[in-house]
């Protein structure tokens, strides 16, 4: 497929971009002291080599009161030499680079700024930090605006091609703009015109300082998705005024960090928020960028072709595959490693204070350290198991010049990833397996399906190395009645879509248990097509449609022994999963132990004592156990044996892919 819109150039003031692909600012955690590091330079250099048109880096704190540890600092001249090294590297590889000017306001943690209170438009408590900021005094406001100006000047001096003013996501400019965080009674509060004043004045000052030709971007929320706050209507008015004040390019996102409307998780449909960019585009004369959940060139091309935006962002898409633009441009889209919006390596890591990585790209953030180089000697490597660990190992070893044979006992590759196909909002995870399969095929890895690796078969094949990546098998707890006819494993249910009764109890509140509950609770709810039909034809009231969306034909209960369900679900995705389960009426019982199963349900014990939960079907989601017996069986038959992925220890997909890749580099 060709992408004529995606790879057409565009000029923003004096900045010419070779294509319409923008990598938005991401908190990466690669600059622990604020100084540019080799890690940061190598990361962005690889994306520039991969063909991105514009890379926006940041957020870059403009002062010492509105940032956090690990961000790229722009608040002092001493950071300029390091930033110059970064901009030179990116531009030497054919891309343009911009700096995002960041002031978090009430989203700043006081612990990050020496215990001082963060600043904001008003003293309104932040649900993100749990802290209440102090309202800026009237005479303090010009000084904060001047910090934006000073940071912008530093950015230009450091070689950045443009700056982006951060006016979205609930940060400081958003806080002045919104009636729920701006309760001021002076000229910066009250009417919408007054609430716009802080942002518009800031933009005007930056424009005046940088001159008429230097590109200035504005990151703006097309809708705050906060009750009582600004919608696309207000965003359009603000954008029109911002353009008059000096903005050349609008980068449109949605929501605040406090919003309960998911923005980036897997359950958000691709291109879901293009309509926000389209709204801003109707209000301004300059170009507009559409953000969020655009992670492949086909989707990006459609956004541009349909007039939804003039440019598109692919931040996590480029974290997953730095070469995405070049692959699309040269007809190799099939070999793109797609972001699947899992958040395991990026957002989950950042929110836990760790540097960002990527589930599907273990080199992310370690570009210089983890390079695929030819092996000293080609060897015959047998990989047993076609899940993510085995496939990643096979691809990496093949790239290094080894003769690789991949053997899988089932009739298809993918392992446990394929179980996600049936789960609403999780189906995109299957893309990770599809991408690995495409790369196996492209590299010419010999693949044998429907063949169990036995000691005798391995002996005849005579490999130099055997890598056991056979995954795991579901655990079977020792409970009375566990072998009953009404008991099934969650894995079997998801793989084979086994029919259950109307009342279902799931034993285990881990990720598999909760996602199985989501799968079952959605059965019988309205499909998107039917919902669209009924809405267009006004066949039912909104209340009836909501009820039909929220209730299926099964009553689902999850039983979990520990205090909290979903302990193995990522922090940045758990809230969406739990919200969906609540919406669908799934009951979750914690600190509840299963003691027996009968034909009529599950006997449990909790703090109140024993009780019985009626159920037609009991689904087991009680964890898994490593499948690695083969390693012991062939221990004296081959020169070298390794065990990776869930066969070593059941964990998540990120760990499986990382282990496969890292072992592949050492063989």
Q: Where on the chain are the PLM-derived regions?
A:
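Short, contiguous acidic/charged loop-to-helix segments that flank catalytic cores in large enzymes
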Residues: 263-269, 371-373, 378-379, 419-431, ...
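Flavin-dependent oxidoreductase catalytic cores
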Residues: 1-384, 388, 393-404, 412
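Short connector loops at secondary-structure junctions
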Residues: 63, 218, 253-257, 408-423, ...
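N-terminal Rossmann-like dinucleotide/flavin-binding domain of flavoprotein oxidoreductases
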Residues: 415-463, 562, 567-591
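Rossmann-like dinucleotide/flavin-binding elements
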Residues: 304, 378-407, 413, 448-456, ...
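Flanking helices and flexible, charged tails adjoining ferredoxin-like Fe-S electron-transfer domains
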Residues: 203, 367-376, 399, 403, ...
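Helix-enriched interaction subdomains in cytosolic or periplasmic regions
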Residues: 340-354, 458, 462-479
């Amino acid at each position: 497929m060709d992408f004529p819109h995606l790879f057409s150039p565009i000029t923003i003031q004096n900045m010419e971009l070779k294509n319409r692909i923008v990598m938005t600012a991401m908190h990466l955690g690669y600059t622990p002291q604020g100084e540019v590091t080799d890690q940061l330079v190598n990361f962005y250099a690889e994306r520039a080599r991969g063909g991105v048109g514009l890379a926006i880096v940041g957020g870059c704190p403009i002062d010492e009161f509105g940032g956090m540890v690990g961000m790229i600092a722009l608040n002092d001249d001493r950071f300029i030499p390091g930033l110059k090294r970064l901009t030179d590297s990116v531009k030497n590889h054919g891309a343009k680079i911009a700096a995002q000017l960041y002031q978090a306001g009430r989203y700043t943690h006081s612990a990050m700024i020496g215990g001082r209170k963060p600043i904001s438009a008003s003293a309104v408590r932040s649900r993100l930090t749990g802290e209440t900021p102090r309202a800026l005094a009237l005479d303090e406001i010009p000084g904060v605006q001047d910090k934006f100006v000073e940071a912008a000047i530093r950015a230009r001096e450091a070689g950045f091609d443009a700056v982006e003013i951060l006016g979205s996501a609930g940060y400081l400019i958003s806080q002045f703009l919104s009636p729920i965080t701006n309760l001021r009674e002076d000229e910066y509060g009250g009417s919408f015109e007054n609430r716009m004043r802080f942002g518009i004045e800031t933009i005007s000052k930056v424009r005046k300082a940088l001159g008429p030709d230097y590109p200035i971007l504005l990151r703006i929320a097309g809708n705050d998705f906060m009750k009582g706050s600004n919608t696309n209507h207000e965003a359009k008015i603000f954008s029109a005024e911002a353009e008059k004040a000096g903005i050349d390019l609008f980068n449109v996102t949605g929501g605040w960090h406090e919003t309960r409307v998911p923005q980036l998780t897997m359950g958000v449909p691709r291109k879901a928020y293009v309509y926000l960019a389209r709204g801003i585009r109707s209000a301004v004369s300059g170009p507009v960028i559409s953000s969020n959940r655009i992670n492949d060139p086909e989707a990006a091309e459609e956004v541009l072709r349909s007039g939804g935006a003039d440019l598109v962002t692919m931040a996590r898409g480029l974290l997953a595959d730095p070469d995405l633009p070049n692959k699309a441009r040269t007809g190799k889209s099939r070999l793109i490693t797609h972001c699947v919006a899992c958040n395991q390596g990026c957002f989950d890591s950042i929110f836990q204070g760790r540097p960002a990585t990527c589930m599907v790209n273990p080199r992310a953030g370690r570009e210089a350290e983890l390079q695929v180089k030819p092996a000293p000697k080609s060897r015959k490597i047998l990989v047993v198991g076609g899940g993510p660990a085995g496939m990643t190992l096979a691809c990496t070893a093949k790239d290094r010049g080894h003769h690789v044979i991949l053997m899988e006992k089932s009739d298809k590759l993918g392992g446990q990833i394929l179980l996600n196909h049936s789960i609403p909002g999780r189906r995109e995870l299957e893309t990770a397996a599809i991408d690995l399969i495409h790369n196996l095929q492209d590299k010419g890895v010999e693949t044998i399906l429907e063949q169990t690796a036995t000691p005798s078969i391995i002996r005849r094949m005579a490999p130099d190395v055997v890598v056991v990546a056979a995954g795991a098998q579901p655990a079977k707890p020792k409970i009375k009645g566990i072998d009953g006819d009404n008991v099934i494993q969650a894995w079997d249910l998801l793989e084979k879509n086994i029919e259950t009764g109307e009342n279902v109890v799931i034993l285990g509140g881990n990720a598999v248990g909760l996602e199985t509950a989501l799968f079952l609770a959605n059965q019988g709810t309205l499909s998107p097509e039917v919902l669209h039909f009924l809405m267009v034809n006004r066949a039912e009231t909104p209340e009836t449609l909501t009820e039909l969306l929220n209730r299926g034909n099964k009553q689902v209960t999850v039983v979990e022994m520990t205090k909290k369900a979903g302990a193995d679900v990522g922090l940045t995705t758990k809230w969406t999963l739990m919200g969906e389960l609540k919406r669908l009426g799934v009951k979750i019982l914690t600190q509840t132990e299963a003691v027996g199963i009968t034909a009529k349900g599950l006997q449990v014990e909790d703090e109140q004592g024993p009780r019985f939960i009626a159920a037609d079907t009991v689904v087991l989601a009680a964890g898994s156990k490593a499948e690695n017996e083969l390693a012991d069986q062939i221990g004296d038959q081959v020169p070298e044996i390794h065990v990776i992925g869930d066969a070593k220890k059941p964990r998540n997909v990120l760990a499986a892919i990382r282990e496969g890749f890292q072992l592949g580099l050492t063989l």
